[in-house]
Amino acid sequence: MKRILIAIVKLYRKYISPMKRVPTCRFTPTCSEYALEALQRYGAIRGSYLAVRRILKCHPFHKGGFDPVP
């Protein structure tokens, strides 16, 4: 399961993200980098939870900034 989720994030980074032309993530590391690290470090369940929680924070009303994987 973990490998499938990592593959999905990598596919997003390779094919979907470049279509946006301008980087839109307000965080460092980017949300996709964060998701990859969380999945690799914590596995499918907890890594997915952390990634989704981070993506939900990525909106215009959040200040963003440096937010590493715990």
Swiss-Prot record:
Pfam families hit by this protein: YidD
Localization annotation: Cell membrane
Stretches of the chain forming a coiled coil according to its record: none
UniProt keyword annotation of Cell membrane present: yes
GO cellular component, as recorded: plasma membrane
Keyword annotations: Cell membrane, Membrane
Disulfide bonds: none
Membrane topology of the entry: Peripheral membrane protein
InterPro entries, sorted: Membr_insert_effic_factor_YidD
Function per UniProt: Could be involved in insertion of integral membrane proteins into the membrane.
PANTHER family attached to this UniProt entry: MEMBRANE PROTEIN INSERTION EFFICIENCY FACTOR-RELATED
Similarity remark: Belongs to the UPF0161 family.
NCBIfam families: membrane protein insertion efficiency factor YidD (TIGR00278)
Protein name per Swiss-Prot or TrEMBL: Putative membrane protein insertion efficiency factor
Species the sequence originates in: Lachnoclostridium phytofermentans (strain ATCC 700394 / DSM 18823 / ISDg)
